[in-house]
Structure formats: C-alpha cells, structure tokens
Amino acid sequence: AQKLNYINDGDDSTDEDLGCNEIWLMPISPSPTYHKYDVTDYMDIDPQYGTMEDFDALIEDCHSRGIHVIIDFVMNHSSSEHPWFVAASDYLKTLDADEEPDLEVCPYVDYYHFSREKLEGYTALPGSDWYYEARFWEGMPDLNLKSEAVRKEFDEITSFWLDHGVDGFRLDAVTSYETGQPDEITEELTWFNDMVKAKKSDAYIVGEAWTNRKSYAPFYASGVDSFFDFSFADSNGNIAKILHGAGSAADFAQSQINAETLYQSYNPNYINAPFYTNHDMARSSGFYSGELALQQTKYALAMNLLMQGNAFL
C-alpha cells in the first residue's frame, strides 16, 4: 500500500504522489525464465510474484486509488514447456515419415506452426523429423493465431483476467504475429480487440509494434486503442534529439503533428502511447553526459509526459 500511495494515493488534494492512473504489469504468469515472456500457464500467477489472492488484493487496492491495471499479454508464442506444445511435440514424435498429423487425435498440433521442411524462422524438434516456428528462440514456439482453437483459448484466458478485474492488455511482439504480413496482423488485432471489448467495452489495449511509424500506423485500423510510439523513444529518438541539439522545438512539434495526422487516418479515436524508454532499452540516465545530464533527463521526461495520449513512464 505504501508504494501504491507513491504512485497515486487517491487524494487529489495531495502532491506527494506521482498521480499515475495506470499500472502495466509485465508478464506475471508461470514461466521458466527470468523475463517470463514464455508462459507455461496463462491462467495463474508465477509463485515468484505471489498468489492469485495477492493479485486480487492488488487490483482492489489499485482501483480504490483510481489506478487502472493492464497486464502484459503474450500470445505470439508460449513456452516450449507449455502443456499445449509438449502434447503436440510428443504426438509428432510418434508419426512415421510419411504419416500426417490427425488433429482429432492431437488438436494441439494446430496450435503451433509445424513443418517437415526447414523454413525460415523454424527450428528442429528434437527426436523427430519436424520443425517448428520459433522466431525469438527455441524455447518460445510461435502460436498459430489463425487457429480457431487457439482463439477460443485466448477468449477464455482474457475472460479469466477480466473477471479478476484487469482493465486491459498490453500486446507483446505484435509485428511477429505474422512475420512480414501486416494485413494478416491487422486481422488478428481486429479479432482480439473485438473479442475483448465485447466483454468489456472500456478495456484499454496497447500494442508493442517495434518498427517505424509508417509500418505500424495501419494497425490502428484494427480498433486497438494505442501502439507504443517508438519514434520518440530511446537515445536517438525525437525527444533525445532535441536535448542533444540535433533538432529544434519546431521539429519536435511537427513530428507530433505528423504522427497525429497519420494515426487519425486509420482510426479517428486512436490514443497515442508515447514513452521515453522501456525494459528492452538502455536506462535513460545514460542518454546524456556532463554537468547538464540530470537536467536534460528531467526535460526529456517532462516532454514525454506533455505529449498527446497516454504517456508511459
């Protein structure tokens, strides 16, 4: 409760809290790795973080202070230790070289992308002549988001978390849903957005599409509320450029106007999600050097907060 009060104490008359109205929790579900972006159970809490009862208490405390909670939602891939992948792998290892999988025997084969050919982005399935798509690494097999069975699973999973009080979702690795196929990604984002908002119309969804602005802007046509605006982030982004003397205030303003015009062309109700740095980037304290570094960092954070949309810290 003490740390929540630092974020937002729920009292508008005080000025000792940050006044934030939303918390984004990075992956909290069971996982064999430190980062937990490879989930083994989508409907539980990793013991390192506590229990479901702890989570429910957190939600209640946050809501009492006017803080919304969104959770990281990793549906591009699961862990290779997830029961879905284990079942599919074990089944494929039983097949003869000329035998095709029977989805009635093992429906989980359709949950992932398997092939007997070594395709780009695929890795060998040990003990078999099969390969599976794993764009990040072999411990993160890519899920088949076109599969109706997979979509049904995520329908149930999102319902579970909404029933536990979450206010929305942060979608991880959006550009990897269908590598090199932006129209297919937009379709999958549309499905997810419509599915979630049919259950909670005011749910907030923000996507991570780590690419240039022109490439991810069309994803706004899906109805997803926000996408992180990478053009302003990191040590070489539009915010840092100004403070390094590589651009003017007019350039910064025009960049925002250009972004707003572009995003609105795909979704008039879009909400930009500007940020300065995140867990995948270097710490912002190292973006500057010299006696003005602290002041430059403060200015940068102020610029981020004053941008249009939902600013993430």
Indicate residue ranges for each PLM-predicted region:
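A Trp-anchored, charged/polar loop motif used as the substrate-binding/catalytic surface
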Residues: 1, 148-157, 248-261
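Acidic/aromatic-lined carbohydrate-recognition and catalytic surfaces
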Residues: 1-152, 163, 174-222, 227, ...
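Hydrophobic residues within beta-strands of alpha/beta enzymes
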Residues: 23-25, 169-171, 312
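Active-site groove signature of glycoside hydrolases
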Residues: 75-77, 155-180, 269-281
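Catalytic-core region of carbohydrate-active enzymes that cleave or remodel glycosidic bonds
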Residues: 190-205, 244-313
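Short, charged, surface-exposed secondary-structure boundary motifs
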Residues: 236-243
